[in-house]
Amino acid sequence: MAASVFCCLRCCRDGGTGHIPLKEMPAVQLDTQHMGTDVVIVKNGRRICGTGGCLASAPLHQNKSYFEFKIQSTGIWGIGVATQKVNLNQIPLGRDVHSLVMRNDGALYHNNEEKNRLPANSLPQEGDVVGITYDHVELNVYLNGKNMHCPASGIRGTVYPVVYVDDSAILDCQFSEFYHTPPPGFEKILFEQQIF
């Protein structure tokens, strides 16, 4: 007992606050350990260019996740979710069971099957912000903050945000500090926390 009291007092002696500093959670960004060989990631892990795909650094563990991509330069691109088994060198994604993506033509693909499509008059253009919600069942697309009512589903397992580019496309990712307020109940990606 005396040892435990001494331990507690030791934290407070010499004007100490008794607080133990907590580690700051890392920021979610594009993961250079999980990207295609011809992909270039810049702007502190927030911009993708080159050719190929890249996963984000954190999986979608919470029930309702939201993230955004801003189209800086048009070309061939796709955004959505994927497992770590996806081939990030083989684009377009959405051709197998390991990815569910919306492509630049507005089609949502999973397992080489078109699951849904944006209205023809609502295709994302340069400067637009595309938001993605995912609730472990359904992926939904938002264009400049507006729900496109274009759900798609089918992917299983632990998924990560994914983006791919080709043909001079440049996209910026936002995993926090969003351009548009997430829909009710959805929030930024949270790192899974472990307490030892």
Curated annotation (Swiss-Prot):
Protein name: SPRY domain-containing protein 7
Species this protein is from: Bos taurus (Bovine)
Keywords: Acetylation
Residue span, B30.2/SPRY domain: 2-184
UniProt keyword Acetylation present: yes
PANTHER family (UniProt xref): C13ORF1 PROTEIN-RELATED, SPRY DOMAIN-CONTAINING PROTEIN 7
UniProt cross-references to InterPro entries, sorted A to Z: B30.2/SPRY, B30.2/SPRY_sf, ConA-like_dom_sf, SPRY_dom, SPRYD7
Residues that bear N-acetylalanine: A2
